[in-house]
Each structure stands twice: as structure tokens, then as C-alpha cells.
């Protein structure tokens, strides 16, 4: 069994307010995506990394691969219009076999703890898949500027990445989505649509996705604390 990590890195990063996509901006001396990739480079359970990116950033990623000795990166493929398209392009380019695991992780989640990654891989090896989530702690409402109803937070999770699936299951789910003109916000939605049960694994509050300027400031503070 081989474990292949797919990192879709084609987001525009418009909500962060940055001029360039946030994953290519330097924070604490390294591009954001390097912080993310090093988590996978350093984890012994990960065998290979495939990146999907906009064509005009592929050269930069090749440079970063060499500069930071990211030796597990086997391919850098062109991404698509949607995140789903980028993941699918990377998945099709892989040489994964039926018993191999495919990890999908957001490029803009650089603070993924090693124990969360390792635990999710182990769960996927045992149960066939793993979806990293954190339990909701806040009171949750449904509505549009006016409260319509309250959700039971004991039954609600915030979905994160990594999301891990057996290669043939994820490929089947992707093909099904395209056959039905469906675009999902993550891979677990696609896998559930083909009848698979998805296993929840505990995530971390530090594994947040950097989307806004406030997230960038939070990342800097947490990363600096880790270096102390």
C-alpha cells in the first residue's frame, strides 16, 4: 500500500486581500505552501506528493521543490477551474493502484499537526477512509441575517483536511460527479454520493484554512510560538 498526497494549489486567494495567491506569499521566510508541503515531506507515512497549480506558478513550484529539498514531490500538474478539477487532474496523473491511499489536503492549511496526519492515515488504512474534522463548540444557527432555527451542535462538525480515501473509491466518486455535472466543495461529499460511509477523525483548531487577512495574522502568531 502506497500513500499519495494531492495538494491542490490553484486558489486565487482573493479574500486574503493579497496581490498574489496567498499560498505563494512568504511568511516567516518561506512561501506558505512550503510550510504545508514540509508537513508531508517530514511524515514517514507519506510516500509521494502531487501538486496541482495554475500553469504560471508551476515554474515557481519546481524551484521551491529543489530549494527546500521536497523530494517526495513526484509531479506538478496543471490545475483546473474548480478545486475539484485540480484534484481530479492530479488523481488522473497518479500511478496509484487499487490498494493505495490518496490524501487530499488544502495548500492553505500549513499548521496541520503531525499527529493528526498520522492518525488519519492509520484510520484510513484500517477503515478505508478518513475525514479530519473538529467538533462544533459554538451555538449554531440557520438563517440569513435573521435567525430561522438552531442546530444541535452535538451533531455538527467543522470539516477540515486531510481527507483520505482508497484510490479506486475516490476515482469512482470523481467520475460520478462529472457524469452528473456535480461540483462539490470537498471530496467527502463526492464519496458520500456514491454510497460510501465516511469515517470522522479528530482534527485540530490549529489546522485552520488561511482565507482572510485575520487568518494570516493568526498563522504568523501560532507559527512563531512553535519556533520558540
Descriptions of predicted regions:
Residues 75, 81-143, 160:
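Conserved beta-loop-beta/alpha segment of the NTase-like Rossmann-fold superfamily
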Residues 26, 111, 150, 164, ...:
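Short aromatic/basic micro-patch
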Residues 141-165:
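Short, flexible, basic/aromatic active-site loop/helix in glycosyltransferases
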Residues 34-99, 178-180:
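Conserved N-terminal catalytic core of the sugar/cofactor nucleotidyltransferase
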Residues 158-228:
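Conserved alpha/beta core of the MobA/IspD/sugar-nucleotide pyrophosphorylase nucleotidyltransferase superfamily
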Amino acid at each position: 500500500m502506497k500513500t499519495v498526497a494531492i495538494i491542490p494549489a490553484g486558489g486565487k486567494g482573493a479574500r486574503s486581500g493579497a496581490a498574489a495567491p496567498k499560498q505563494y506569499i512568504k511568511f516567516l521566510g518561506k512561501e506558505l505552501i512550503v510550510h504545508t508541503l514540509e508537513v508531508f515531506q517530514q511524515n514517514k507515512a507519506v510516500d509521494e506528493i502531487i501538486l496541482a497549480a495554475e500553469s504560471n506558478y508551476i515554474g515557481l513550484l519546481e524551484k521551491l521543490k529543489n530549494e527546500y529539498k521536497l523530494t517526495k514531490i513526484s509531479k506538478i500538474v496543471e490545475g483546473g477551474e474548480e478545486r475539484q478539477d485540480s484534484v481530479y487532474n492530479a488523481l488522473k496523473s497518479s500511478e496509484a493502484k487499487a490498494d493505495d491511499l490518496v490524501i487530499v489536503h488544502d495548500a492553505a492549511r500549513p499548521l496541520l499537526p503531525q499527529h493528526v496526519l498520522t492518525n488519519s492515515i492509520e484510520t484510513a488504512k484500517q477503515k478505508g477512509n478518513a475525514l479530519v474534522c473538529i467538533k462544533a463548540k459554538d451555538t449554531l444557527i440557520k438563517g440569513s441575517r435573521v435567525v430561522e432555527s438552531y442546530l444541535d451542535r452535538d451533531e455538527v462538525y467543522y470539516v477540515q483536511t486531510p481527507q483520505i480515501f482508497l484510490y479506486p473509491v475516490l476515482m469512482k466518486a470523481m467520475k460520478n460527479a462529472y457524469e452528473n455535472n456535480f461540483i462539490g466543495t470537498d471530496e467527502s461529499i463526492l464519496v458520500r454520493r456514491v454510497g460510501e460511509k465516511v469515517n470522522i477523525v479528530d482534527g485540530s483548531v490549529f489546522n485552520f484554512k488561511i482565507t482572510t487577512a485575520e487568518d494570516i495574522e493568526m498563522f504568523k502568531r501560532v507559527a512563531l510560538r512553535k519556533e520558540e
